[in-house]
Amino acid sequence: MKARTILAAMAAVLMTSAAANAAQVAALVGNDTIAWVDTVQKKATGMTKVTGISGALVGIDVRPADGMLYGLVEDGTVVTIAQDGKATMKSKLDTMVAKGLTVTVDFNPAADRLRVIGSDGMNLRANVDDGKVTKDGDLKFAETDMHKGEKPNVVGGAYINSVKGAKETALYDIDGTIGGLLKQAPPNDGILSAVGKLGIKADKVAFDIWSDGNGKNDAWLMAGDTLYSVDLATGKATEAAKISGVSGIVRDIAILPGM
């Protein structure tokens, strides 16, 4: 076997192994449909319409505190979503991002609060148990960042160490205009620093981070039917798999636990 062939085979094995870490993924397709994606088989094993909601879902995430899949509706209603698609209301946020914007949602595993970010820069922190929302600092690039003065366009975001009982975490975002990975630190202040370019178009992408609970974090991005791994140190996105059975705009993804 030629050296080039060996290297290609090794790369394929490594990418297959990496995709396996993502395990089962819930992908929000359109306004109200969940595609259940098996990253090992590289296909959607089912498409489920979410019932019991009034309006469009704008984001989904797994809450580390209870392992359940949550969804946020455009009017601020927070629901849990069962495997059969049935939505059960948890609360209604007292403050919500304006309709028509791209919304990013992800649970802070250390604080057990839902981060809600609008593509206009609004930066919210919500208690999903009672719906109370704290409006944090609007997003802006750090004074020392190369993008200082530019308007952020965050279209995805996720925390590392996303497991129950996490003591430390950090928030990473995707900017659709720059096409790059950002770090939001501190998250409550909304200060953004560029990590690096993804190398792909990023205006319509979904983003989440898988954590093993021992410090390992693998970032994943889905654009249409393509799943990418994202290097949190450089921002580079690398194609991991083409997922069959997924059609339409994937608005968000949530990596499911224990699958």
Indicate where each model-derived feature is located.
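Structural signature of eukaryotic scaffold interfaces centered on beta-propeller domains
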Residues: 58-67, 96-112, 148-167, 202-215, ...
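Loop/turn residues immediately N-terminal
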Residues: 31-35, 67, 74-79, 120-123, ...
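Blade-level signature of beta-propeller repeat domains, shared across WD40, Kelch, NHL, RCC1
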Residues: 232, 237-259
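Gram-negative bacterial Sec-dependent N-terminal signal peptides
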Residues: 1-22
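Conserved beta-propeller blade signature
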Residues: 24-28, 68-71, 113-116, 166, ...
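An edge-strand/N-cap motif at the start of beta-rich repeat modules
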Residues: 22-40
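Short loop/turn segments that connect beta-strands within beta-propeller blades
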Residues: 39-42, 82-86, 127-131, 185-188, ...
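A short beta-strand motif characteristic of beta-propeller blades
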Residues: 43-52, 85-96, 135-147, 190-199, ...
